[in-house]
Amino acid sequence: MGVPALFRLLSRKFAKVITPVIEAPTEKLPDGTEIEPDLSLPNPNGVECDNLYLDMNGIVHPCSHPEDRPAPETEDEMMVAVFEYTDRILAMVRPRQLLFIAIDGVAPRAKMNQQRSRRFRSSREAALKEEELQAFIEEAKQQGIPIDENATKKKSWDSNCITPGTPFMDTLAKSLRYYIINKLNSDPCWRNVRFILSDASVPGEGEHKIMEFIRSQRVKPEYDPNTHHVVYGLDADLIMLGLATHEPHFRVLREDVFFQQGSTKKTKEERLGIKRLDDVSETNKVPVKKPFIWLNVSILREYLEVELYVPNLPFPFDLERAIDDWVFFIFFVGNDFLPHLPSLDIRDGAVERLTEIWRASLPHMGGYLTLDGSVNLARAEVILSAVGNQEDDIFKRLKQQEDRRNENYRRRQQRESNQESESYVDNVVIQRSVETQSTEVVTSSKSTSVDTKPPKKTQKIDAPAPVDLVNLSEKTSNRSLGATNRELINNRAANRLGLSREAAAVSSVNKLAASALKAQLVSNETLQNVPLEDSIASSSAYEDTDSIESSTPVVHPIDTKVSNVGQKRKAPDSTEENENTDTVRLYEPGYRERYYEQKFHISPDEPEKIREAVKHYVHGLCWVLLYYYQGCPSWTWYYPYHYAPFAADFKDLASIDVKFELNQPFKPYEQLLGVLPAASKNNLPEKLQTLMTDENSEIIDFYPENFTIDLNGKKFEWQGVALLPFIDENRLLNAVSKIYPQLTEEESKRNEDGSTLLFISEHHPMFSELVKQLYSKKRQGKPLKLSGKMAHGLFGKVNTNDSVIPNVSVQCPIDVTSADALQKYGSIDDNQSISLVFEVPKSHFVHKSMLLRGVKMPNRVLTPEDINQVRAERSFSSRRNNGNSYRGGHQSYGVRRSYQSQSYSSRQSYTGVTNGFANGGVQPPWSGNGNFPRSNASYNSRGGHEGYGGRSRGGGYSNGPPAGNHYSSNRGKGYGYQRESYNNNNRNGYY
């Protein structure tokens, strides 16, 4: 998920980072046969890719519940959809060296809190959706509308099964193994490409498995620094992870989530599966493929070079260190592991505010905030203190902005009140002739809520039995008084759409009746094909789509003229009862005491408890940064609160001793029990299900049927905080250990840690040597280290894996029915590939945040006009924040200053404001304006000339005082830094 709305922010602020993907067209022969493009030809996007990495969860989710077509009815159909989706990505990217497929395995405990919240919300939404469907069926029956009972009884697919340890994930792993083998055997384009599969049995989040692999390759002396990487995924944090690699040839591939094909709002008929007989286009309707886009990290680096540059520093400016700092302070705005600081909202310009504070503070901090994933807490306190000084003003301004939005909304509501009150029923005007008993239907041209697609001229058709809309609404209103769930549905709808509860109920009933009437007008036949998933609108109604899992689906029980439900915040109607009163009132004096009392249950006379929350949050910041830059520092650490402290309370941070114990990840079943609600119990073995449902279970309190969602000042439920109890690890492990002996062999196997697999075709240059060495009698099962010419640029250890060997038959693990699928995914009679157990090499040294020697930087893309635009926005941001209580006021680029180049140990010079290595430096294309005249001085890539120590005896990361950060491992490994120092005479930086 990452930082909510980050992708949208970057695509708007730095427009050129986004470019469309060019896909080679499929050639069609006269007989209708389609010929796929030749993928061995140069990539039409103009850039060749060496390594492609697939964050597979970003493929499974859109394939399991697509937006542009009916959802697959079986898991086998889902697997075929996954194959086809992956084929499309391969055709776009055309990797020449490696394809790395990573599926989310067991996540660190810090991530499980977010996963638990998301899955409980999903279960709650499904229950409300089912309740609403039953209400619709009841209303339809009262109107005499026959409903297909088989369709209404269809069980919805539980997306919570996309979690390690479930039978679905086991099927996915088997299917992908077959997919890879099939590719290597049937498609000559991929015979020289190596495939690596890290499935859900291998612990770790998919994107972090990918980053661990990239880091492991970078540290090898033989690694090619000009390797071109592409990562596919929908999580916004892939952008930050891409920056954290310091690989300039790096792109992120993703669907264009903002692409809209026509109207984004489905009609009632479409959502309920009602087919119009007069709409012949429906049968020929072909879904339009959603386009893909590149996010170019190299161009983002260009933008950040301008955005983050600070003149007149007492130490040399280092772009790599500045980027690391930028990645770090964006964590304050929110991430998957910590709640965002109360005063920092990305939609309120928090990123720009933090950037401005950082630029103003950097000259006075003595150095950068971070070093290779470790935080200097004393300097971090400078930034947080500056934010804290602004908190009062921020909260007041947010309240003023909200009041203005509400007032503007009320004015619009007043102007449109007549049209709004008529709502959906005005779309259809019925005139019934007493003499002819026929009806004339006229469709209003003003309607925007429903696409009725009327005939070209008015028609007369036989009238159905009359429908009493008024009586229906009265009956429903009376009946809903005692229906708790139904009332909840209407209340939720009213809260989202800015309607009163009464208006929502009446509107829902009126439109239900109108929809039923229209269906009768079209046909008196039985309504068919009303699946549970499509019966009531369900969409990802969130403000910014940064991840396929970034929000909970929101049920829409009523139709309205508001088409962008959940995308644009709506002010409440003046008549609405405010059920979610903001009792904290951050904009009024005394908010600090109210906030801690209500959110943390801490009274004003307990400052030590606030300090404890601050310590936990600081640990969280250090944990997240290490996770991004070095790998998981602790599998068991987590932030034990639902909310973050105020920035003003982050004081004396240098005295906080930050240490982590690595420990071990959960087993898959332990994670399932930690994140799934009881409604998803079927994803677990039957013996373990009792822990979630038996009232005598020792952990039954982990699975509440009802829980509170605190809107926390927001408008929509998905923005709120799910107040679920935190899992007690010891109680969970103790309970599950008693049941493990009762599991079957197959069930126990799904709970075991698996291995990463490497697949190679017989035609690959390294195949023969690998087989010769691995299967020799001398080897006797020992792993083989890939190095030298045999490695062909891939480093790690491999060992035999007898599950896939050459010259044997391989069966497709899924049942395919379509002729096309049968042709593509049949049995492989004579396998010509091999799979090996692959071990990602473990480094005993800290991964350095630096460009590698010998890298050739991409050509610059930004023009002087682009750079001036960034400058102008910086200047505007500075003026807007001028006068706030942090040092520096506002800055501009209009200062003539010598910008020093960087000198690496190779004696090559990297010109500071350019992104290119060259002997003697490369003059930046926009330096002619005099702002950045080049200097002949050179300095070390580390910017602050820090010294780097070797292994620490204590086994830990350490910046030394004042930060005092440590990283320790119960496995006895650890690495340390010496204290940061600035030394004008030190040019190499390493000693």
Swiss-Prot record:
Localization (cell): Nucleus
Main location: nucleus
GO molecular function annotation: 5'-3' RNA exonuclease activity; RNA binding
Sorted UniProt keywords: Exonuclease, Hydrolase, mRNA processing, Nuclease, Nucleus, rRNA processing, Transcription, Transcription regulation, Transcription termination
A Pfam family reported for this protein in Swiss-Prot or TrEMBL: XRN_M
Protein function: Possesses 5'->3' exoribonuclease activity. Required for the processing of nuclear mRNA and rRNA precursors. May promote the termination of transcription by RNA polymerase II. Essential for vegetative cell growth and chromosome segregation.
Low complexity bias (residue ranges): 433-452, 878-889, 896-910
Name recorded for this polypeptide: 5'-3' exoribonuclease 2
Enzyme Commission designation: 3.1.13.-
Family to which this protein belongs: Belongs to the 5'-3' exonuclease family. XRN2/RAT1 subfamily.
Gene Ontology biological-process annotations: cleavage in ITS2 between 5.8S rRNA and LSU-rRNA of tricistronic rRNA transcript (SSU-rRNA, 5.8S rRNA, LSU-rRNA); DNA-templated transcription termination; mRNA processing; nuclear mRNA surveillance; nuclear-transcribed mRNA catabolic process; positive regulation of chromosome segregation; rapid tRNA decay
Annotated Polar residues bias: 926-938, 980-991
Gene3D superfamilies, per database record: 1.25.40.1050, 3.40.50.12390
Motif (Nuclear localization signal): 264-268
